[in-house]
Amino acid sequence: MARINLLLCLLFLVVAPVRAQTKLDSLLPIRGFCIAAPLPKQLDSFIQFINDELAPRQVNTLILRVDYNYQFDSHPELRDSIALSKREVKKLVKACQKHNIRLIPQINLLGHQSWASKVGNLLRVYPDFDETPSVKMPEKYVWPNEDGLYCKSYCPLHPGVHAVVFDLVDEICDVFETDAFHAGLDEVFYIGHDKCPRCSGRDKAELFAGEVTQIRNHLALKNRKLWMWGDRLIDGKTTGIGMWEGSFNNTHRAIDLIPKDVMICDWHYERPDQTAVYFAIKGLSVITCPWRKPGFAVTQTQDMVRFRKSVTPIMKERFQGMMQTVWSGAGPFLDEFYGKNVSTEAGENTPSNCFKALYDEIGKLGATN
């Protein structure tokens, strides 16, 4: 009898977590976390975070913003000076596989090719890819500025740009052993510039949709899916959402021109806007992405669960879940999360508190639904 009881206890310990995960998969198929890929010196502590914090919370998708923090073989000239090796990336892959976490790399394509006063690696090495070469990087960056410079873009019609960036995409997807790639594509202010010899006078929505489609089609050659931020597909003026979380340069019309199998990461940080409904109605799968306001994360999670419950079966499959976003490096986030460096100025509104609130709410909803 004692042996039978022991076997039953062991069986329960094995089955209970599986049942809990299956229930959550039905409630919210995607439960994500997005952050910059760790630097080599942060690798071990980040893997411990995966083991101790992400896995127990049933996070099943991890997006790492890699950009040039990898020792690319295809284009070593684009590597950051300090970058992850293939062996180090494989440690991340192994940790995620251990916990059935889908690992997706991100490289910013099209936009975000500069930051503040510094041009990014791609345009530094290949300046002819620049959409706006006449716009010079300032010694001291301020916003707003007379050039409308937030971040530079590469020219999507430059004949040489995709040969380079697709080499990077293929290599990073291979080393990550992934079936998806996140291309960024957010906050693209420079597109179809009037001084670009290739893009001037062209429809900006068509230019944006063309770039999304070209990236998607390239990924599809190896059965990989494209993920992207959704802000450029929202009419920022008509909705009142504004120029950051929405578009002021007419790229929003691209929503009717892009393939329907693109995954939209719909981020809203100032209000819990319910634009996930808009993307789903347009035939696109969508996840909602909070950042640093715990109350908004709770509301957005409740909304996502409600959307899935209250729509047709076809629409339900488009509301895919939630993803916490972090816009610092992995090191600063871990210091904040573990209380080593806490901002008293931010109060409760921090990414670490938002992450905890988001997954506490997912846990509660999983227990009651």
Would you name each region that the model predicts?
Residues T22, L28-R31, S45-Q48, A55, ...:
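Substrate-binding groove of N-acetylhexosamine-processing glycoside hydrolases
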